């Protein structure tokens, strides 16, 4: 079942998980869809406690010498700073459509990125691929946040969540 692109299937999976746990259920959404908002709303209606987005974009590379795909599956997950604008857009769209918390991720690699995600509507921000480049990236972001907040006259991060309408 390809529940990533079908609102009804995503709702069904959400309900099934909610039925077997009392813990909060946060649904991670794929960006490889035409309408992420309808999927997020279906998950919310099915009882999701939060939405997390985005996962990797589908990508592909071809070896010029062999003229074959670089990876055996032909396509795979594309992540890192290049997907950040896509992630910000989708966080903005979903945060403006649901009432549950939204966790933003996808290409986050700086304190500025954290603030941008929160302005788009993220109530929390995750760092993924940047950890592979710099295992201390989370420490660095936390260290840099006060200075960046001061630069943009932000006293408390909670005041900027969803600040862009």
Describe the function of each predicted region.
Residues 1-2:
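Short, small-residue-biased leader/transition segments that mark boundaries at the very start
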Residues 10-15, 37-41, 91, 114, ...:
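Generic structural signal for well-ordered alpha-helices
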Residues 18, 44-47, 118:
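Non-catalytic positions within long, well-ordered alpha-helices that form the structural scaffold/packing
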Residues 20-31, 96-105:
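Short beta-strand/loop segments at the ligand-binding rim of alpha/beta enzyme cores
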Residues 31-35, 57, 108-110, 131:
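Active-site-proximal loop/turn and secondary-structure-junction residues that shape catalytic pockets
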Residues 78-99, 103, 109-165:
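Alpha/beta catalytic cores of nucleotide-metabolism and tRNA/nucleoside-modifying enzymes
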């Amino acid at each position: 079942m390809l529940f990533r692109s079908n609102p009804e299937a995503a709702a069904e999976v959400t309900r099934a998980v909610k039925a077997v746990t009392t813990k909060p259920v946060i649904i991670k959404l794929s960006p490889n869809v035409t309408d992420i908002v309808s999927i997020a709303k279906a998950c919310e209606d099915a009882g999701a406690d939060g939405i997390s987005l985005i996962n990797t974009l589908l990508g592909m590379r071809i070896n010029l010498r062999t003229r074959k795909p670089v990876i055996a599956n032909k396509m795979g997950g594309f992540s890192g700073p290049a997907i950040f604008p896509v992630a910000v857009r989708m966080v903005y769209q979903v945060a403006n459509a649901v009432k549950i918390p939204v966790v933003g991720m996808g290409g986050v690699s700086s304190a500025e990125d954290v603030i941008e995600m929160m302005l788009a509507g993220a109530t929390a921000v995750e760092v993924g691929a940047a950890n592979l480049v710099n295992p201390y990236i989370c420490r660095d972001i936390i260290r840099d946040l006060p200075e960046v907040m001061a630069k943009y006259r932000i006293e408390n991060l909670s005041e900027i969540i969803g600040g862009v309408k």
